[in-house]
A protein has these predicted regions:
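Hydrophobic pocket/interface hotspot
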Residues: 8-12, 18, 44-46, 61, ...
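Generic structural detector for well-ordered beta-strands
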Residues: 2, 29, 47, 60, ...
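A short, structured loop/turn motif at beta-sheet edges
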Residues: 5-6, 37-38, 63-69, 87-96
Length: 141
């Protein structure tokens, strides 16, 4: 992405920006009071709708390395396990943003039957995020 590290990391450091990069049909809504200071140990509560069902989700920022990476872990929510690592790396033509998600579905082994459907949904959500991030940073440049 053609932008500088400070601008990109500042964008991702503001929890309110999650609403800008989340598909509307997920009805993403942060419940924690603003402002939210992002740092290791920060807890964020929000509500999200998946497959027409609303879930409360509690996230812990378990790692915080400004302008390098941060990790959010689901403490409460629809997954048995959810660890999302956001990494940022300076490249010649801008910043490379990398998302890595490690997750496990609930109700093992029955939850695994939903894996193909969940995988498609996650791919669609992250494709949407990618396109929105590109649009937002094009507008800022």
């Amino acid at each position: 992405m053609p932008a500088n590290m400070r601008r990109v990391f500042d964008f991702f450091s503001n929890a309110q920006n999650l609403e800008l990069i989340t598909p509307k049909e997920l009805n993403f809504n942060i419940l924690s009071p603003f402002p939210i200071e992002m740092k290791e140990g920060t807890l964020i509560d929000y509500r999200i709708r998946l497959f027409g069902i609303s879930f409360n989700w509690k996230t812990l920022i378990s790692a915080w390395e400004p302008e390098r990476r941060f990790v959010d872990e689901q403490l409460k929510g629809p997954y048995a396990k959810w660890i999302h690592t956001h990494s940022f790396e300076t490249k010649e033509d801008g910043i490379m943003i990398k998302d890595e998600v490690c997750y496990r579905l609930p109700f093992f082994p029955f939850g695994e039957l939903m894996f193909p459907v969940i995988r498609l949904q996650l791919n669609r959500i992250f494709d949407y995020r990618t396109s929105r991030i590109k649009e937002i940073f094009q507008d800022l440049n």
